[in-house]
């Protein structure tokens, strides 16, 4: 009888773990006095030095730009994206780029006024032209015997650097000294993960420029101007270290307007450029992954921003994953996190049309499973009602066909956009959050007798998942998480220990004060999920 009882208990407990879909009830309290989001201007890193309402660029924008960039033309970037660009990028687009024909009738003064209006700055406050420190001829060469450092950025996303490769430990880290520094022109932030290869460092920037820097001196070997900010990391074709590659190596990256690029790593010459998604609010944030001459490109979106406006018809964006030929940019397959397009679902309290389900953006770099030939991604919240099973989920696709193998949702009923921040404006979904994305890439770990896929969520929870079928092996609540808290970007593992950084914040400008905050570094046993230590 005791054996039967133990068997039933274990069976029930196992089913509980495998059905780990938690409700959207979170540990927070509502603070009526907390600062809440007043406008989307707060999201832009800038100082406003004009009055947008009275500036002459306002009328010029409405007459020449608004018809496309206020959301009516699918392929045109929404104005909230244009606001994030630096003035030089906008001038580049109008004078030499895709908007040359549309801008031909405008005078130089009118172009300046439009740019002033879009970036909310007077021309005297525009960033000044920068002089780059280009390398002397002897430092312009690339060492082709030095292959890209394989630190787990593009396969199992382990982010683990072995001691014999990194050569930095607790004993010598205090001896590090600054050798050189490179200031990014026209930039207020740096978010692109650099790549080290061929005696050089390749890195993107807020201005949209890609730089190849000499690793010894920091001088510039070449630079390339993309259409917009490059937030993704840089990856490169791989080859065996110590020998020259069989072909000229390319580097790959994406910009915030959802373009993906391939450049010749030695010259910076553009090899190909593709638009990864036609939605005006699509973007590229996560680094692509390359495997067997195929580039896997995740697509995210920020339609949550225009949804703040009462007259915006929210929402139609869907997260996506593309497989393309690395040499040519030819799309082999594309899958959406939400398999079917959003449908009309009614009107808001002010009469604006609504669509859904939407969202489930892919913030995470794809995780390539070479043994199973699967590729894993994590999704964010839905943007509009109804919430479906695509949000806050880990999804496995077949590498060769793109067919979905399994999906595991760990938080049901999560639909959220900026209209929910404090005031609950008309476009806020019925679910009203809590916005608990998977924004950190999963990690595939070999435990010897089995593999485990580990995923961390903004909810502050970590899951150990069976990569064969998506069943949850263990789960651990590390903290209370939050809209801008929990596991945001990047866990790491040496195979036995999982390193979990937490970004818990008290006030996230949404009127909620999150409880059970544990910001810092936490470590878990990869086999059991037990917490080892926390700092």
Can you describe what each PLM-predicted range is?
Residues 22-60, 131, 138-139:
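Electrostatic cytochrome c docking/interface patches
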Residues 75-76, 157-163, 187-192, 211, ...:
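Short, solvent-exposed loop/turn elements at domain surfaces
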Residues 57, 61-72, 90, 114, ...:
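The canonical Cys-X-X-Cys-His
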Residues 17-19:
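Boundary at the C-terminal end of the N-terminal hydrophobic targeting segment
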Residues 27-31, 76-124, 374:
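Extracytoplasmic electron-transfer domains, predominantly the class I c-type cytochrome c fold
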Residues 87, 170-185, 210-230, 235-282, ...:
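Extracytoplasmic/lumenal domain signature
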Residues 33, 133-179, 337, 342:
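Blade/loop signatures of beta-propeller domains
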């Amino acid at each position: 009888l005791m054996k039967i009882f133990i068997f039933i208990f274990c069976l029930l407990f196992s089913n509980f773990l495998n059905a780990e879909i938690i409700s959207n009830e979170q540990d927070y309290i509502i603070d009526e006095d907390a600062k809440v989001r007043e406008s989307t201007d707060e999201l832009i890193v800038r100082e406003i030095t004009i009055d947008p309402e009275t500036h002459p660029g306002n009328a010029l924008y409405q007459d020449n730009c608004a018809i496309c960039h206020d959301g009516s033309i699918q392929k045109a970037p929404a104005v909230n994206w244009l606001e994030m660009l630096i003035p030089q990028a906008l001038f580049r687009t109008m004078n030499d780029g895709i908007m040359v024909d549309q801008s031909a009738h405008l005078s130089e003064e009118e172009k300046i006024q439009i740019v002033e209006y879009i970036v909310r700055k007077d021309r005297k406050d525009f960033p000044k032209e920068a002089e780059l420190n280009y390398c002397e001829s002897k430092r312009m060469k690339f060492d082709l015997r030095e292959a890209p450092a394989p630190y787990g950025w593009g396969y199992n996303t382990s982010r683990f650097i072995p001691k014999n490769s990194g050569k930095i430990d607790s004993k010598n880290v205090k001896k590090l000294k600054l050798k050189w520094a490179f200031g990014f022109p026209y930039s207020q932030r740096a978010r692109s993960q650099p790549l080290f290869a061929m005696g050089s460092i390749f890195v993107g920037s807020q201005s949209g420029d890609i730089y190849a820097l000499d690793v010894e001196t920091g001088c510039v070997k070449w630079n390339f101007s993309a259409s917009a900010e490059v937030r993704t990391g840089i990856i490169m074709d791989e080859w065996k270290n110590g020998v020259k590659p069989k072909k000229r190596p390319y580097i790959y990256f994406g910009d915030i307007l959802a373009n993906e690029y391939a450049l010749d790593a030695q010259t910076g010459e553009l090899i190909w450029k593709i638009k990864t998604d036609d939605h005006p609010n699509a973007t590229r944030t996560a680094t692509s992954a390359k495997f067997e001459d195929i580039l896997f490109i995740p697509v995210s979106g920020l339609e949550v921003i225009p949804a703040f406006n009462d007259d915006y018809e929210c929402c139609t964006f869907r997260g996506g994953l593309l497989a393309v030929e690395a040499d040519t940019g030819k799309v082999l397959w594309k899958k959406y996190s939400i398999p079917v397009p959003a449908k009309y679902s009614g009107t808001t309290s002010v009469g604006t049309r609504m669509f859904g389900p939407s969202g489930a953006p892919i913030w995470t770099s794809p995780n390539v499973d070479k043994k199973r030939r699967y590729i894993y991604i994590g999704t964010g919240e839905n943007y509009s009602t109804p919430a479906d099973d695509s949000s806050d989920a880990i999804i496995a696709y077949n590498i060769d066909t793109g067919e979905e193998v399994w999906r595991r949702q760990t938080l049901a009923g999560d639909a959220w956009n900026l209209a929910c921040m404090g005031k609950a404006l008309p476009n806020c979904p019925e679910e009203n959050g809590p916005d608990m994305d998977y924004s950190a890439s999963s990690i595939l770990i070999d435990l010897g007798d089995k593999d485990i896929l580990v995923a961390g969520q903004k909810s502050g929870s970590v899951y150990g998942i069976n990569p064969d079928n998506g069943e949850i092996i263990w789960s651990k609540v590390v903290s209370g998480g939050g809209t801008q808290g929990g596991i945001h970007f990047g866990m790491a593992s040496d195979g036995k220990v999982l390193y979990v950084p937490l970004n818990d914040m008290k006030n996230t400008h949404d009127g909620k004060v999150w409880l059970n905050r544990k910001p810092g570094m936490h470590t878990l046993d990869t086999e059991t999920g037990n917490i080892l230590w926390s700092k």
